[in-house]
Structure formats: C-alpha cells, structure tokens
From Swiss-Prot:
GO cellular component: photosystem II reaction center; plasma membrane-derived thylakoid membrane
Superkingdom, taxonomy of origin: Bacteria
UniProt protein name: Cytochrome b559 subunit beta
The encoding gene: psbF
Keywords, in A-Z order: Electron transport, Heme, Iron, Membrane, Metal-binding, Photosynthesis, Photosystem II, Thylakoid, Transmembrane, Transmembrane helix, Transport
NCBIfam families xref list: cyt_b559_beta (TIGR01333)
Keyword Isomerase among record annotations: no
Molecular function terms from GO: electron transfer activity; heme binding; iron ion binding
Cofactor(s) essential for the protein: heme b
Localization per record: Cellular thylakoid membrane
Length: 48
C-alpha cells in the first residue's frame, strides 16, 4: 500500500507577471474613477 509519489507533493510553483493586459485595463479605469469620485466629493464642500 505504499505509493511511489508523496501524497502531499508540492506542485510546480508558477511565477505570474505583475503587469498584464488585465492589470493595465483595471488601472486605466480605476485611477480616473477614483480621481473623479474624489473631485465630486470635494465639490460638495465648495460654497457658492
């Protein structure tokens, strides 16, 4: 009943790139969105 391979053998470790097309797309949308939300929030405190 002995197995030639260890049952809890670690799988190959993959190294993923940080900058991907998805990363660029998310940040291209997220950064201006946060900027505009902050701008709109700041406008609420500007007295006319």
């Amino acid at each position: 009943m002995t197995n030639s391979q260890a049952p809890m053998q670690a799988a190959e470790v993959r190294v993923y790139p940080i900058f991907t097309v998805r990363w660029l797309a998310v940040h291209a949308l997220a950064i201006p969105s946060v900027f505009f939300l902050g701008s709109i929030a700041a406008m609420q405190f500007v007295a006319r």
